[in-house]
Amino acid sequence: MDMGHWYVYLPLRRLGHEVYFYDTVEPEEKDYKKIIEEFKPDLIYCCLTGNKSIAPHEPWKEILDETNSGRTKTFNWFCDDTWRFDNFSSKACSYFSVCSTPEPAYIEKFKSIGYDKILLGSWHANSEIYSPKSFSERDIDIGFVGTPTLSRRDYLVDNPIPVEIIFNVSTEEIFAAHSRTKIGLNLSVNDNDPEGGTQMKQRIFEIIAGGGTLLTQYHKGIENFFEIDKEIVTFETMEEFNKKAKFLSKNERITKSIAKNGYQRLLDEHDSKIRLSKLLKQIEEI
């Protein structure tokens, strides 16, 4: 099931909204214009990628027509601005009434090209679909949920620190794995970025929603969302990762305290319902 179902559709329904979920991979009704005319939405909430290989039914023309008509607000949630701003986001944003970026530093980049209707759209996680276990019940000491790509081998395979890798599993098993993990590892480098840069990852919020301690590769701007060394732990080098992973593994009291603080911050500010409610209000005000 698409993460949009768990992190957008279900929370919006919980907030009391009537929502039509259009699957851009294999939609039940392929005539998007027909859907608009029948459903008559107040807002068209999108996460369009421009990648036909993964989402062959993205309705770009229909979205642009609706934006230009002025009768319905259209919105796009951009995900990968650190490496797709120049060749995608900077061009696609004009199709929508308003857009968001997960990168604080990219707000000004959008404005510099004349697109002012840009919002900071923080990643978030739906706490209602996780079942955090007590630390004594957690059977994964250090875990990484994701594909062990070549760039991640140094941390996941060629390293004396044992990391349990969870991949090629169902979405429900991903939620369960985060809820069973004491220390959740996030690697922020994006393999699709030719320059090997880091970016904000949804995994950051998923680890914390599962109740574990987040140990994450540092990415500029993460301190806008969590307090470093109180709610999360960051590293920039392999040596720093090894040192902090060993420390957290040997000091469970501190590890549990950081996990508790991070989880409370997520519930207060980064739970899907809270983030989406705030985002909808910002969209309405534009």
Each PLM stretch: what is its role?
Residues 1-39, 46-63, 85-90, 94-228, ...:
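Nucleotide-sugar donor-binding catalytic core of glycosyltransferases
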Residues 179, 205, 243, 253, ...:
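A broad detector of short, well-ordered amphipathic alpha-helices
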Residues 65-81:
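Active-site proximal beta-strand in glycosyltransferases
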Residues 250-281:
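A charged, aromatic-enriched C-terminal amphipathic alpha-helix characteristic of glycosyltransferases
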Residues 69, 227, 267:
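Short conserved AdoMet
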Residues 238-246, 262, 272:
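Catalytic phosphate/metal-binding cores of nucleic-acid and nucleotide-processing enzymes, i.e., regions
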Residues 232-238, 247-252:
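Conserved acidic donor-binding segment of nucleotide-sugar-dependent glycosyltransferases
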